[in-house]
Amino acid sequence: MTDCIFCKIVEGKIPSRKLYEDDDMLAFHDINPLAPVHFMIIPKKHVDSLAHVGPEHVEVLGKMMAKAGALAREAGSAEGFRTIVNTGRIARQDVYHLHIHILFPGQANH
């Protein structure tokens, strides 16, 4: 999508503080964190929201969830973390590119 801010981050047109990147997904720090540690994981291929996920997205979503735990542990989440996916306007989804928020009240190591 040409006007999607997350697609522009994937394309390198907008800078981000990256935590992880591979061929399918990107993880980066939230620019307006709601906790001392707050980052997001997005699929590189545009999907509007969790409501638009189909069978073709199962593999990347599984990888994203597995990476969420690994990145949270690397950032110091020994006690646990929150995983949030806002879906649609009523749920306060602000950017219509599927993203998983990972946050916890710890000290950021990145």
Description of each model-found segment:
Residues M1-H110:
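HIT superfamily nucleotide-processing domains
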